[in-house]
From Swiss-Prot:
Family: Belongs to the PTH family.
Protein's UniProt name: Peptidyl-tRNA hydrolase
Database matches in Gene3D superfamilies: Peptidyl-tRNA hydrolase
Record site: Stabilizes the basic form of H active site to accept a proton: D103
Species the sequence originates in: Oleidesulfovibrio alaskensis (strain ATCC BAA-1058 / DSM 17464 / G20) (Desulfovibrio alaskensis)
Source organism phylogeny: Bacteria, Pseudomonadati, Thermodesulfobacteriota, Desulfovibrionia, Desulfovibrionales
Chief site of localization: cytoplasm
Site positions per UniProt: Discriminates between blocked and unblocked aminoacyl-tRNA: N12
Amino acid sequence: MNLDGLIVGLGNPGKEYENTRHNLGFMLADALLDEVRRTAPHAVTSLGTGKKKYDLWKCAPLTGGSSWLVAKPLTFMNRSGDAVAHICGFYRIPPEKILVLHDELDLPLGRMKFKTAGGLAGHNGLKSIAERTGSKDFHRLRLGIGKPQSGQTTGYVLGRFGKDEQALVEKVLQAGVEGIRIFAQQGAVAATQFINAQDIQ
């Protein structure tokens, strides 16, 4: 299988975590798959859903015919690296060809940043991926969720977006899908320029 790389949306499995702030990476992965299916219905191929470690799809048209894998780990956030390491080992994908989609407390909702390698910003999903792949050299699309006013981080990230935030979340997902397309087609520099300029209101 000729692959350009792996796109990983981070989140926690199970209905109790659906549409929570910590699952914004899952939500963007779903939005990407939905958009590809909408424009090219036969371009998304399931490579196994409901597996022990991950759901996985092949997305053909992101770069005009070549293929990317899209994954959602089912191992819970703190063990996301188990799924990523398994996929990368099986399909021989190096860390520099991985793009991780994840929530980011240090950015407000409506802002996003593209980053390659470097620190992990205390994100347990990123820590797990770095530990299990043995590298920090993967790309990240950091999706702002803002910080809680009270400082109770766990309850905040596991809470759902409010009704007044839903329209903004949809705009973020649309911009995120476009950012992923730019990354797949033009590379990290172009993706950084587009994504880091986003200030969605």
